[in-house]
């Protein structure tokens, strides 16, 4: 391997380390903000305050706070050294981390107030940008930042394709070359596999009655005598055997689908286990894409998803989805279960959406919440 290859590999690893450090510190800062909002009325955490909770619970809260604050402090210096490589979204994440660390400069977060800066932060930010632009290494830092973002995008797309294609390929290949021949071979010897389900039996009986009526109707239209009992019996016997084969095939098809789905699930879990680092990069990539949207675009996407899954016309979509899943798994689509599911699950989803907007989006992007309310009729 040449020197350029070694340098490229080192730069790629360094960029992934920066993304990982920024993601960990950002999640820790969000955890601290969540503790402030939930237990301290959106004020800084104070370890000398009694929260009125059980001692074990209060101890756990403070332990989580200290751990998150240590992560922010430990990673902040290394991230700030590579500030020039960060894009606009990552700089916003870094600003959140810095604001959290500044709030807790004293030991154990005892201070409630911090001394105001002598100059506005926006003016200091302008000076900092000018200094970075005049830095002799500014061009190298910009190129390094571009390479890091490019590597992050490639890693994200690769793990995303693996998470989609590996389960699909495993499902189709295992079903075609392993599961189907195996089930077809052992099904006649195992009563459970060759047993025709009651729903399929009822469908076969209805088809047989319809076939008998078609024979009699065709004889009346052609002006012929009705078939004799023996002829009718022979035709019905052949049709019954055909319907039984179709029912058996449909029954084994459901079993094949279930086994293939299990194989696909195992493949997906293995991809997630062996690609934990890449999944962290993928999360950062999605965060960058989502937070890079304008406020109107964010509000539009939220309204679109809520209307699809919990909106006025969502019951029809849930009905079609549940019936398709039931047919795929070979189980009867019970109307009572579908009605109960539609009456409860969309309500739970709507509650989760509202809680997420109140708890998270309202802090990260208040302007998006305002735009969302305006686009949603003020609700």
UniProtKB/Swiss-Prot annotation:
One of its GO terms (cellular component) is plasma membrane. This is Proton extrusion protein PxcA. It comes from the Bacteria. Keywords: Cell inner membrane, Cell membrane, Hydrogen ion transport, Ion transport, Membrane, Transmembrane, Transmembrane helix, Transport. Belongs to the CemA family. It is found in: Cell inner membrane. GO terms for molecular function: proton transmembrane transporter activity. Required for H(+) efflux immediately after light irradiation to form a rapid H(+) concentration gradient across the thylakoid membranes. Together with PxcL, contributes to transient H(+) uptake following dark to light transition. HAMAP family: CemA_PxcA. The keyword Signal does not apply. NCBIfam families: PRK02507.1-4. The chain crosses the membrane at residues 153-173, 254-274, 300-320, 337-357. The keyword Cell membrane applies. Pfam families: CemA (PF03040). It is a multi-pass membrane protein.
């Amino acid at each position: 391997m040449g020197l350029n290859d070694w340098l490229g590999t080192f730069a790629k690893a360094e960029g992934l380390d920066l993304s990982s450090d920024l993601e960990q510190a950002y999640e820790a800062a969000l955890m601290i903000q969540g503790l402030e909002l939930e237990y301290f009325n959106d004020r800084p955490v104070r370890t000398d305050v009694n929260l009125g909770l059980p001692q074990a619970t209060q101890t756990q809260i403070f332990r989580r706070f200290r751990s998150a604050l240590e992560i922010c402090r430990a990673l902040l210096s290394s991230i700030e050294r590579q500030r020039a490589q960060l894009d606009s979204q990552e700089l916003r994440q870094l600003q959140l981390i810095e604001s959290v660390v500044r709030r807790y400069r004293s030991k154990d977060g005892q201070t409630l107030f911090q001394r105001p800066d002598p100059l506005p932060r926006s003016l200091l930010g302008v000076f900092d940008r000018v200094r970075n632009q005049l830095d002799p290494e500014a061009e190298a830092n910009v190129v390094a930042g571009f390479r890091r973002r490019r590597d992050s995008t490639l890693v994200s797309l690769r793990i995303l394709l693996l998470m989609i294609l590996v389960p699909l390929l495993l499902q189709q290949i295992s079903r075609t070359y392993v599961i189907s021949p195996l089930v077809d071979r052992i099904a006649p010897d195992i009563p459970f596999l060759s047993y025709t389900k009651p729903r399929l039996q009822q469908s076969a009986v209805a088809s047989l009655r319809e076939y008998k009526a078609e024979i009699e109707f065709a004889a009346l239209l052609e002006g012929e005598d009705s078939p004799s009992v023996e002829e009718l019996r022979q035709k019905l016997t052949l049709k019954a055997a055909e319907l039984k084969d179709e029912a058996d095939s449909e029954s084994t098809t459901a079993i094949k689908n279930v086994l293939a789905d299990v194989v696909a699930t195992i493949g997906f879990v293995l991809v997630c286990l062996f690609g934990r680092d890449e999944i962290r990069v993928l999360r950062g990539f999605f965060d960058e894409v989502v937070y890079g949207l304008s406020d109107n675009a964010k509000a539009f996407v939220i309204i679109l998803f809520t209307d699809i899954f919990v909106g006025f016309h969502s019951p029809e979509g849930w009905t079609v989805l549940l019936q398709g899943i039931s047919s795929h798994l070979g189980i009867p689509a019970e109307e009572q279960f579908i009605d109960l599911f539609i009456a409860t699950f969309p309500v739970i989803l709507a509650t989760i959406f509202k809680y997420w907007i109140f708890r998270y989006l309202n802090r990260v992007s208040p302007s998006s919440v305002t735009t969302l309310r305006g686009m949603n009729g003020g609700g």
